[in-house]
């Protein structure tokens, strides 16, 4: 069995880790970074960029640069939070045929799992480059408060990326694993406060030694899947845009390019204000009007930022209270508070967590990496590398069915340990009813209409009888990923109907298979594209070097030799405009051979030219001094 990796698929950044022996290790990507921006861009040339390269070009290509896609995964287009998001992002959010929220870039409509699959593929490649072997399986994390549709959509993204998703694990639970694996201090109750780029979760977890096993039991979880660093950024963006409008009477919010620059600047300002008391946002030439170019310069203090986001921070406290109530604990029962997610670096957020739980949060857990590390530990458990660890997670929301009068009847209460199975007997509502519709719901409202509809199916062929007589046995079965299977059985006839819940929408099997095929085709396409780009760069460098050498040789170059090289350069330039790899390679070889002969001539002529001894000695001496200076500088850089 190959290595199972752990992936934190984040709203803003993603991270991959794996077990090395009995220690988890975070893997650096090709750029040398331990986290990768969860950004996917599509260029005019048809190239797909992922991570830092996608983020870098966002300013010039905002409509085709997709970020914070996790906020849309498994969601319906008509949901209020999606409608709010449409106003926040420069790319198009569109309604799919099945009512889901999809996105559009370069004229192509895509499902969020398809976009997220690009990020997962980059994580997979990062691990493969490190291991030197193919990776086929992963544990992927999701916010604890993700519903069934969102979990299923995340699993679909993994499959499209070419990964077998061995387990979907909740982010706070993963962070608790990262924190608690090497702690041997008896029983502990910890609160994991996870404020990331797009989501907020809080979980109350008990870590205990049970018969030699390290047991992690989630007592309760709560959260808000549309609250995170992106919302904090939006407040700063709006503030800066308003200040600029007051000063210049120009509203930047109608200009996608200016807004993308503003988004980058807001993110940087927010980060700076975690360690400084004030910062300046400087954006020269941000826009222009009839009077000329306009420059943006706005000073923001830490106090101003805190006042802008105060209500967002306060929104995290409600779920904390509910989580404690559900766990039947008070704040004083909590032994440790673990902060996870990049937004918890903000001092005011740390202060809010400290004030609520009444203790200083721990600083020895890396908020950006803890979730991926925990996923790697769970991967190690599944792969047999990590022994004596038992993880008992919970379902975040209650599950049930719609019954007479539009009521939701709960079969599985929220915070029930998973995997779990629950059966309940229902009956017909009318005389001689021969079929029942089982409408599966997730949520906490008494009214069925106020909850998330996960799907519905019919059980037919019930023998006619008085209402209340037939016995319909409904079974809910939640697997370890938190994904639901529902079955209904007529006890009299033994007839049974069942579904794996994939939401009332979600991706159909055929769509997933098409996306898997597309992804595989694109890997080959992208490889060929990259080869052509590399060849063109090689050709450009060769042309530049050859033309420079010709200039240096000047009239020392014979006319026929010069015209031959110019002809070869022209042929290479023509070849580089086409997409034929073999032809470009052949023309590069021709020019390499021609310029090698010219270089040989240049070298021979220089060697034959007599030079004054004094000057030569002086030059040599100067060269030595220069070389020494350069070398020392390089060594210093290496040391730092």
From Swiss-Prot:
Biased composition (Acidic residues): 622-632
GO molecular function, one term: unfolded protein binding
Composition bias, Basic and acidic residues: 611-621
Region (Disordered): 603-640
One Pfam family in the UniProt entry: HSP70
Record carries keyword Nucleotide-binding: yes
Gene3D superfamilies, A to Z: 1.20.1270.10, 3.30.420.40, Actin, Chain A, domain 4, Substrate Binding Domain Of DNAk, Chain A, domain 1
Annotated positions of the Phosphothreonine modification: 199
Keywords of this entry: ATP-binding, Chaperone, Nucleotide-binding, Phosphoprotein, Stress response
Induction pattern: By stress conditions e.g. heat shock.
Family: Belongs to the heat shock protein 70 family.
Purpose: Acts as a chaperone.
Name of protein: Chaperone protein DnaK
Native source species: Nitrosococcus oceani (strain ATCC 19707 / BCRC 17464 / JCM 30415 / NCIMB 11848 / C-107)
């Amino acid at each position: 069995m190959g290595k199972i990796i752990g992936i934190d698929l984040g709203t803003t950044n993603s991270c991959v880790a794996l077990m090395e022996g009995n220690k988890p290790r975070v893997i650096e990507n090709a750029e040398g970074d331990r986290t990768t921006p969860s950004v996917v861009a599509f260029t005019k040339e048809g190239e797909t960029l992922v991570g830092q390269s996608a983020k870098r070009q966002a300013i010039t290509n905002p409509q085709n640069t997709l970020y914070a896609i996790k906020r849309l995964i498994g969601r319906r287009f008509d949901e209020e939070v999606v409608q709010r998001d449409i106003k926040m992002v420069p790319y198009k959010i569109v309604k799919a045929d099945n009512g889901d929220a999809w996105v559009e870039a370069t004229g192509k409509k895509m499902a969020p799992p398809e976009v997220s699959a690009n990020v997962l593929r980059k994580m997979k490649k990062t691990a493969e480059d490190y291991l030197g072997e193919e990776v086929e399986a992963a544990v992927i994390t999701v916010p604890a408060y993700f519903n069934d549709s969102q979990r299923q959509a995340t699993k679909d993204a993994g499959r499209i990326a070419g990964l077998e998703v061995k387990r979907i694990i909740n982010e706070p639970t993963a962070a608790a694993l990262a924190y608690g694996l090497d702690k041997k201090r008896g029983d502990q109750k910890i609160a994991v406060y996870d404020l990331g780029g797009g989501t907020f979760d809080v979980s109350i977890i008990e870590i205990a030694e049970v018969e030699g096993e390290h047991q992690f039991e989630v007592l309760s979880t709560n959260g808000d899947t549309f609250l995170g660093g992106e919302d904090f950024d939006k407040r700063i963006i709006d503030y800066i845009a308003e200040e600029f409008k007051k000063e210049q009477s120009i509203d930047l919010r109608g200009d996608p390019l200016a807004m993308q620059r503003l988004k980058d600047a807001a993110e940087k300002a927010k980060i700076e204000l975690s360690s400084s008391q004030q910062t300046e946002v400087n954006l020269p030439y941000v826009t222009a009007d009839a009077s000329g170019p306009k420059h943006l310069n706005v000073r923001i203090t830490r106090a101003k930022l805190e006042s802008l986001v105060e209500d967002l921070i306060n929104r995290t406290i409600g779920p904390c209270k509910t989580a404690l109530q559900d766990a039947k604990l008070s704040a004083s029962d909590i032994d440790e508070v673990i902060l996870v997610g990049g937004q918890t670096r903000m001092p005011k957020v740390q202060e809010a967590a400290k004030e609520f739980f009444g203790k200083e949060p721990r600083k020895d857990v890396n908020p950006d990496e803890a979730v991926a590390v925990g996923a790697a530990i769970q991967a190690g458990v599944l792969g047999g590398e990590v022994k004596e660890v038992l993880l008992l997670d919970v379902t975040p929301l209650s599950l049930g069915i719609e019954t007479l009068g539009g009521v939701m009847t709960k079969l599985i209460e929220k915070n029930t340990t998973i995997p779990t199975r629950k059966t309940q007997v229902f009956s017909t509502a009318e005389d001689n009813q021969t079929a029942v519709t089982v409408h599966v719901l997730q949520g906490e409202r008494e009214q069925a209409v106020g909850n998330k509809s996960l799907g519905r199916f019919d059980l037919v062929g019930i023998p006619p009888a008085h209402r209340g007589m037939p016995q319909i046995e409904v079974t809910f079965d939640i697997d370890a990923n938190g994904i639901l299977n529902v079955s209904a059985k007529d006890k009299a006839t033994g007839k049974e109907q069942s579904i794996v819940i994939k939401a009332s929408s979600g991706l159909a099997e055929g769509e997933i298979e098409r996306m898997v095929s597309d992804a595989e085709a694109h890997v080959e396409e992208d490889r060929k594209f990259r080869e052509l780009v590399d060849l063109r760069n090689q050709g450009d460098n060769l042309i530049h070097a050859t033309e420079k050498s010709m200039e240096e040789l000047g009239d020392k170059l014979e006319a026929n030799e010069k015209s031959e090289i110019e002809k070869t350069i022209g042929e290479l330039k023509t070849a580089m405009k086409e997409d034929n790899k073999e032809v470009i390679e052949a023309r590069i070889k021709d020019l390499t051979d021609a310029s090698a002969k010219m270089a040989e001539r240049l070298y021979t002529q220089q060697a034959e030219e007599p030079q004054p001894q004094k000057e030569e000695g002086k030059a040599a001496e100067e060269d030595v001094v220069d070389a020494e200076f350069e070398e020392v500088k390089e060594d210093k850089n290496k040391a730092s």
